[in-house]
Amino acid sequence: MARSVWKGPFLDGYMLGKADKARASGRNEVIKIWSRRSTILPQFVGLTFGVYNGQKFIPVLVTENMIGHKFGEFSPTRTFYGHAVDKKAKRK
């Protein structure tokens, strides 16, 4: 079920301050965040966030197409190695 419109988008409180500081400094440095559940807002377009996936920070450059999505969608937590190959079928 989607979030109610009257509540507005979810965002951890510290993130707006970090984004404002990064934009004011003018340097394009990675902003480290642990909040995968936060919604991407229009103010974040053009900034690079390091989204923690449980092991390391994955750099995510925010574009206009990402607005309204969650940060966790762009930082995968699991590695897919492929399905096991049947050795008997491969020999034929």
UniProtKB/Swiss-Prot annotation:
GO MF annotations in UniProt: rRNA binding; structural constituent of ribosome
GO cellular component, as recorded: cytoplasm; small ribosomal subunit
Pfam families, per database record: Ribosomal_S19
Keyword Isomerase in annotation: no
Key words, A-Z: Ribonucleoprotein, Ribosomal protein, RNA-binding, rRNA-binding
Single GO BP term: translation
Annotated Gene3D superfamilies: 30s Ribosomal Protein S19, Chain A
PROSITE patterns for the chain: RIBOSOMAL_S19
SUPFAM superfamilies, per the entry: Ribosomal protein S19
Family of the protein in this entry: Belongs to the universal ribosomal protein uS19 family.
Function: Protein S19 forms a complex with S13 that binds strongly to the 16S ribosomal RNA.
Protein known as: Small ribosomal subunit protein uS19
Source organism (scientific name): Paramagnetospirillum magneticum (strain ATCC 700264 / AMB-1)
